[in-house]
């Protein structure tokens, strides 16, 4: 599980300075987008980025509970801040996100030094909740509520690629997953609000946006309770068309998709819209229909293959990535081999893999036939080896080809290189300047020629 820290900004505070802040983000892209929003609120309130975590006047941990390892890391960080608070009583400790929602009062009892504990549905209430903290209260905010439309401009972690939440929550009931219980029911933002945010990004010079949702292709389903006619019309396909022609935006991505809602209409739309990038992340989780049924995923391997085959027929150069869980309770050797076979058959460009981790208050955590750690380690090692080999094989198709790259950053391991991604989401490294000394700038779209490939990245030269 990675930890992502937001970078500093030079924007002045909107209100009188109140002190420095530090945000550490654990987990998924949704959390990263939430952290950007909360950072924007903090800076509106008068907070400014700290030089480092241990010098901050306010620390905020935006947490993840998808696996136990992420939880344990949060507890370690909290322990360090609790010690700080003994000598710095004015230090504010904020815990947000899925772990906060899941643990609630028990987390406050475990770490009483926490000033504010809030679930992911409360990100936009951060200012009012911190005002309660300033009045001397210890605040717990985990009750379910309607998502407030965005009230403060996020402080983006990138100046070129922007996250845009379009749907919050999840209505699925996968037997291994805590997300529905911690992120609440699906709530779609209106197309008008989304378009307005994307237009603001375009005016600020952003070239690429990634639309985000726990099940992004379920966008618009919840509108049915308000207006059945509107629900039938407002889908992810509709939204992509609605925002596609915004001037300045050159690339559109979306994640994460659920196979149940990935329709032919959506694939057709993506094939017709030139700004939609040719990369689709569609988790499959297992290659065994038995395991998929036990997981409560709501589709079969056959229906999943139909989706992938249709994508390949309509968008032949598309890159496909997915997620897989190994060692789910009751997973036999045959079930596991079916997962390996599926990966080998589809030839995924990348697969995010994980060994099953029992999560509190999920059905699968209490089932018999839990697999031991030795099996988990063995299967995870084997599947990762297969994924890496196929990824390198797939990347061979890029060698000696010209690719469009959006320059995102300087290579942190080599200051003479820049880095960016192809439209198919391949991370690519290339020199900072042409032979004549002209240097490319961050945020530019350029053409490069791929000279070397590795399993998960490419090397290129400038054209």
From Swiss-Prot:
Q: Which organism is it from?
A: Prochlorococcus marinus (strain NATL1A)
Q: Which SMART domains match?
A: Elp3 (SM00729)
Which Gene Ontology molecular-function terms are recorded? 4 iron, 4 sulfur cluster binding; metal ion binding; methylthiotransferase activity
Swiss-Prot/TrEMBL cofactor(s) = [4Fe-4S] cluster
Q: What is this protein called?
A: tRNA-2-methylthio-N(6)-dimethylallyladenosine synthase
Q: What is its EC number?
A: 2.8.4.3
Q: Which residues bind [4Fe-4S] cluster 1?
A: 28, 64, 98
* Residues annotated as domain MTTase N-terminal: 19-135
- Keywords on this record? 4Fe-4S, Cytoplasm, Iron, Iron-sulfur, Metal-binding, S-adenosyl-L-methionine, Transferase, tRNA processing
């Amino acid at each position: 599980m990675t930890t992502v820290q937001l970078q500093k900004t030079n924007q002045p505070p909107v209100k009188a300075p109140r002190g420095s802040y530090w945000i550490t983000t654990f987990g998924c892209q949704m959390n990263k987008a939430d952290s950007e929003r909360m950072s924007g609120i903090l800076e509106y309130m008068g907070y400014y980025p700290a030089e480092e975590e241990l010098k901050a006047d306010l620390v905020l941990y935006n947490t993840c509970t998808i696996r136990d390892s992420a939880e344990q890391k949060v507890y370690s960080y909290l322990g360090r801040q609790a010690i700080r608070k003994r000598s710095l009583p004015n230090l504010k400790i904020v815990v947000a996100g899925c772990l906060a929602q899941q643990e609630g009062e028990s987390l406050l009892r475990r770490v009483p030094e926490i000033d504010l504990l809030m679930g992911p549905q409360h990100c936009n209430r951060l200012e009012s909740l911190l005002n309660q903290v300033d009045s001397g209260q210890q605040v717990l905010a985990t009750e379910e509520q309607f998502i407030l439309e965005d009230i403060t401009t996020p402080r983006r972690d990138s100046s070129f690629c922007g996250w845009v939440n379009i749907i919050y929550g999840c209505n699925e009931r996968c037997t291994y997953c805590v997300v529905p219980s911690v992120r609440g029911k699906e709530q779609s933002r209106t197309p008008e609000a989304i378009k307005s945010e994307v237009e603001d990004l375009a005016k600020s010079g952003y070239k690429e946006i990634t639309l985000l949702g726990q099940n992004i292709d379920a966008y618009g389903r919840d509108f049915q309770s308000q207006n059945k006619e509107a629900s039938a019309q407002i889908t992810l396909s509709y939204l992509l068309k609605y925002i596609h022609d915004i001037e300045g935006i050159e690339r559109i991505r979306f994640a994460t998709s659920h196979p149940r809602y990935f329709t032919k209409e959506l694939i057709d739309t993506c094939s017709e819209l030139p700004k939609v990038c040719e990369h689709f992340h569609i988790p499959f989780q297992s290659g065994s229909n038995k395991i998929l049924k036990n997981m409560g995923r709501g589709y079969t391997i056959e229906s999943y293959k139909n989706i992938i085959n249709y994508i390949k027929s309509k968008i032949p150069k598309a890159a496909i990535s997915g997620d897989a869980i190994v060692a789910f309770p009751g997973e036999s050797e045959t079930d596991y081999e079916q997962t390996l076979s599926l990966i080998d058959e589809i030839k995924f460009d990348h697969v995010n893999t994980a060994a099953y981790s029992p999560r509190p208050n999920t059905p699968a955590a209490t089932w018999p036939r839990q697999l031991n750690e030795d099996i988990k380690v063995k299967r995870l090692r084997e599947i990762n080896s297969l994924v890496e080999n196929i990824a390198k094989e797939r990347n061979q198709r890029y060698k000696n080809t010209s690719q469009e790259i959006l320059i995102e950053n300087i290579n942190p391991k080599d200051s003479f290189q820049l880095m960016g991604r192809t439209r198919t989401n391949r991370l690519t490294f290339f020199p900072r300047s042409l032979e004549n000394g002209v240097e490319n700038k961050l945020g530019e779209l350029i053409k490069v020629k791929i000279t070397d490939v590795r399993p998960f990245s490419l090397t290129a030269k400038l054209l």
